[in-house]
Structures are given as C-alpha cells and as structure tokens.
Amino acid sequence: VDAAVKDCDYVFHVAAKAGVWGPWEEYVRINIAGTSNIVGACLAQGVRALVHTSTPSVVFNGESFRGADESLPYGDNWLCAYAETKAIAEEVALKAASEQLKVCALRPHLIWGPGDNHLFPRVLARARAGKLRIVGDGENQVDVTHVDTAADAHLGALDALLAGRAEPLGAACPIRHRFSLSGRVLRALRQRRGWRRPTPIPQPPMPNGRQTRR
C-alpha cells in the first residue's frame, strides 16, 4: 500500500467488500483492516487528502429515513456485516483527519451505471429466472446514485477538502420502484422477452426479515 500511494497528493479509497453475504472475517479484513492500511500509508507517505467512500448503511437503525443528513449518529442495530464494518471503517478514516491529512467520507447509495457488477446484474438475473420479488406494495422509496454522480461528488469533495464531514449522497429526491430506472428497464424486458411480472410479497416485520436473512 505504501508503494501504491507513494508520491501521491490525494487518495480515493473506494475499495470495499459490499453485499450482505460472506464471512464476517472477510468483511473485517477488507473493510476495516483495509481502511486502516490505507490511512497508515497516507500518513507515512505524506498524502495531503483522503476521500473515503462510505455508505448510508452506517447510520441505518431499522427505521425509514427522509431528509436525513450527516448529523445522524452511527447505527447500533446492524442487519449485516457490511454495514457494521463500514461504520467502523468510516470512523477509522475520519479519526485520521488532521492538518497533515485532510479526510472526508461520502455516503453514496446503490451506485448503478456502466461497470455495475453488483446491483443490476443480480436484479436482471432474478427477473430472467422469474424469481424476482418486490417486498411491500412496490411503492418503497429508495435513493440511488448514478456512477457519474458518485464520481463528480468524489472530485468535488476532494476540491473542497471536507475534512471529517460525511455528506449523504443520492438522487435529488427518492424514487419508487415502479417509476425508477430499474422498473422501466424490467417492464421493457418483460414485454420484449416475455419474462414473468415480479411477485409482490407482504413486507415482513423487521425481526422476521432478519430471521429470513439468516
């Protein structure tokens, strides 16, 4: 890591183990230890600024958010290893902020667009197999972030050197599944290829949802 950041003025730390599947140890190694290694290398090599890619999951507490901002505290009721380890990693990064190393954290949510190998491929695979499910009535509101928006935000954060400040990042307003890009894409593919309509399922209470995840 030292060799990778040597002679660099700025570093964008965007690597992480995302998703909700995998052993706890792997999330710790990549998200927490990996961030610690990046911070240590930046300090050792005299890097001037570090932009850390975080996630809104670090403040999720099981409730819906509307108009949330960076004043929300970290969650303490984690639903997955990803959220918990990313919260710890964000703290590691922000605590390193100093006059020597300017640090900020951004929290883009559900990044999509060219190069996506995480969100849309899985949604399309489930739809193709006729196994896509919609939890609730399909009107759930979720902020998403196009990859171009995320990239612009990282560059803007670097320019502003927002030391120790995490900005919620997402669409200009929440979108609903039925009117989102994913909904339009799925409708077009269903009509063209004859895929099954996604099956709505009742929204389970939170404890039942956790049990299902396990």
Residue ranges and their predicted role:
Residues 10, 26-37, 45, 84-85, ...:
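Glycine-rich NAD(P)-binding loop of the Rossmann-fold in SDR/ketoreductase-type enzymes
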